[in-house]
Amino acid sequence: MSKRDYYEVLGVGRDASEREIKKAYKRLAMKFHPDRNPGDKAAEASFKEVKEAYEILTDANKKAAYDQFGHAGVDPNRGGGGGYGGAGDFGDIFGDVFGDIFGGGRRGGQRQAARGSDLRYNLELSLEEAVKGLTKELRIPTLASCDVCDGSGAKKGTSATTCGTCHGQGQVQMRQGFFTVQQACPTCHGRGKIIKDPCTKCHGDGRVEKTKTLSVKIPAGVDTGDRIRLAGEGEAGEFGAPPGDLYVQVTVREHAIFVRDGNNLYCEVPISFSKAALGGEIEVPTLDGKVSLKIPAETQTGRMFRLRGKGVKSVRSHAVGDLLCKVVMETPVNLNERQKELLREFEATLTGESKKHSPKAEGFFDGVKKFFQDLNS
């Protein structure tokens, strides 16, 4: 029998937020949970279906695969028998949402030592650093495994003992009306073990505050918004649990000359009136140094020139962007009398030939003249 759409199972739209998905799961899990429906196989099947949908849609990678490929994208063992994750323990994910309720007859229940928290480091780079790549040394404040007790939390030469209240289960059960309520053990706080002689350095926590230095290779071509994941470089886990990850969030500072758009770079290059009219060669900046750019005669201000391969190498492929140079004609300033006289002489030579030498300007003023004639007619 084919599986139902996971969004349909939870009764949410495909654009539902994680909070909406969690809320829908909580409502349905309460409805179909085996402790509320003892012996009801249909309710048990519905609970498993709801749980499976929740597990997929709250995992970013699995959700992306499901959205693109459907059930085939998240089947862990195509044809391997059993649904996603098998029958599983009803307590595994249900406990994540509901905490300590509905303990019932579920096995175990001991709280596992928590994985270390992920860390985020905001790294600001210059455009040159981002384009060329480099190795950066980062100082990261974190929680590291205690080197005296090796993360156990117990004094050297001793070890944790089984909690006498919950007998190592980490949870105790209480009867409330129709339900058996399972709560974290108040003695060991859900760990199942007691540290009678805590480590003198970490005071029984198993972790200590530390600033560590990491040498991180930043690949060429990174841009603002890119994120680099360093597996296992986050905070140490509790009592030997796996560490979290470190995420380096990249921000590239604005540049005085260049503006980046993807793999392309843009810049404005000022040119003189005479260079624009007569043509010639100018030097333009690139991230690899100056290069020569040929300017054709009669170049208008705002014209864009493309220098292929002078942009940014993509961080995700071998493609290299271009440098686009916009020439901007600069009006001469601080002229002496001789220079002004020459310009007046030049202006006089254009009298009566404006259509020939300035066709756009002439056309514009003809249009303005016609506009006012039509307005007054």
UniProtKB/Swiss-Prot annotation:
Cofactor binding notes: Binds 2 Zn(2+) ions per monomer.
Main location: cytoplasm
PROSITE patterns recorded: DNAJ_1, DNAJ_2, ZF_CR
Renumbered ranges of CXXCXGXG motif repeats: 146-153, 163-170, 185-192, 199-206
SUPFAM superfamilies named in the record: Chaperone J-domain, DnaJ/Hsp40 cysteine-rich domain, HSP40/DnaJ peptide-binding domain
Binding annotation for Zn(2+) 2: 163, 166, 185, 188
Residues the record lists as binding Zn(2+) 1: 146, 149, 199, 202
InterPro entries: DnaJ, DnaJ_C, DnaJ_domain, DnaJ_domain_CS, HSP40/DnaJ_pept-bd, HSP_DnaJ_Cys-rich_dom, HSP_DnaJ_Cys-rich_dom_sf, J_dom_sf
Residues annotated as domain J: 5-70
Renumbered zinc finger spans (CR-type): 133-211
GO CC term, one of those recorded: cytoplasm
The protein's required cofactors: Zn(2+)
Stretches assigned to coiled coil: none
Places the protein is found: Cytoplasm
One GO process term, biological-process aspect: DNA replication
Gene3D superfamilies: DnaJ domain, Heat shock protein DnaJ, cysteine-rich domain, Urease metallochaperone UreE, N-terminal domain
Superkingdom, natural source: Bacteria
Molecular function as annotated in GO: ATP binding; heat shock protein binding; unfolded protein binding; zinc ion binding
Oligomeric and partner information: Homodimer.
Family: Belongs to the DnaJ family.
Function: Participates actively in the response to hyperosmotic and heat shock by preventing the aggregation of stress-denatured proteins and by disaggregating proteins, also in an autonomous, DnaK-independent fashion. Unfolded proteins bind initially to DnaJ; upon interaction with the DnaJ-bound protein, DnaK hydrolyzes its bound ATP, resulting in the formation of a stable complex. GrpE releases ADP from DnaK; ATP binding to DnaK triggers the release of the substrate protein, thus completing the reaction cycle.
HAMAP family per the UniProt record, alphabetical: DnaJ
Domain-related comment: The J domain is necessary and sufficient to stimulate DnaK ATPase activity. Zinc center 1 plays an important role in the autonomous, DnaK-independent chaperone activity of DnaJ. Zinc center 2 is essential for interaction with DnaK and for DnaJ activity.
The protein, known as: Chaperone protein DnaJ
Species of origin: Shewanella sp. (strain MR-4)
Organism classification: Bacteria, Pseudomonadati, Pseudomonadota, Gammaproteobacteria, Alteromonadales
Gene: dnaJ
